[in-house]
Amino acid sequence: MRSRSSIAVWRSPTRPSRNAVLALAFAALAFAGAAHAQDAASAPKRPVHTFSIVARDPATGELGVAVQSHWFSVGPIVPWVEAGVGAVATQSFVDPSYGKLGLDLMRAGKSAPEALKALIAGDAASDVRQVAMIDTQGRVAAHTGAKDIQAAGHKVGTNYSVQANLMLNDTVWPAMSRAFEAAKGDLADRMLAALDAAQAAGGDIRGRQSAALILVSGKPTGKPWIDRIFDLRVDDNPEPLKELRRLVVLQRAYNHMNAGDLAVERKDNQGALREYSAAAALAPGSTEMVYWHAVALVNMGRVDESLPLFRQVFKADKNWLTLTPRLVTAGQLPKDQKVIDRILKAAN
């Protein structure tokens, strides 16, 4: 099986008092307002006109942002999400500092409405911003500036906000709201449904180019690389939502692979096989997944079951055949030459 590296994380030996936390929150609020005002005054106005959704799943606590725009590489600019803290979408003539500072304030104890109010108050150009925030308790706030290019608006609902600007018409964000509330599935499915509804209602008057989706766990570990369930970007594509959906399915498959690896580590062989099978069903063309499934079977002592999978992979690409003996030295396959020979003969 694939090994997992661990990184030691420094942790404070003492827990700060409630008063200390509150003091930090107020200090962060003052600092954020000053920093934001300075940033807003000097930063260029990036015209990331777009539609987006910020949302929380009340059942799981998951938080997410999904967005599409006719602007190159919208992913690094608009969506900001942190497990255990909140989610922010900052767009229109965008000031990215709303994302970082909004999360800073919510982390320090401010609600989403309090954080957004403070940042707007410190922004001399708030009339061209469009921002939405949600915190871990589902408290939501949104702002559409008076000078955002029309059609522009937002709608706040229970555990979500949808917002859009530079749209073909003013039916876009109401359509997003209806779609999100009616959609089935998990939070990613529902956010994608909202984006699809926006596009179907007319979408960005200029067209479409990029999209992104970030979704984090409702059970934060303090390790962002674990907490992020989806962190996907489509930077430049004529059909960004179709490509984003494809990536979501592929990410689900890899999530199953990771869950299978963890099951192997727990000696839960049946659980591992269920996860690997689920991954294969979602990504039937992936030789990578088939290969590591086969490796896991060998490490379970189920060599006979692994051979057809190895044969399938070796037929697709001989480089996997070259790789296989190297896994022995790396500790990913047993130091049993008879077993390795059987695997390699599967290529014949």
Predicted regions mapped to residue ranges:
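Residue-level recognition of tetratricopeptide repeat
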Residues: D261-L262, V295, T329
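Canonical tetratricopeptide repeat
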Residues: N258, W292, R326-L327
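Short coil turns that delineate tetratricopeptide repeat
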Residues: P284, K318-N319
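Alpha/propeptide regions of enzymes that mature by internal proteolysis
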Residues: Q38-R206, L213, D235-R266, A281
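Canonical positions in the second alpha-helix
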Residues: A279, Q312-V313
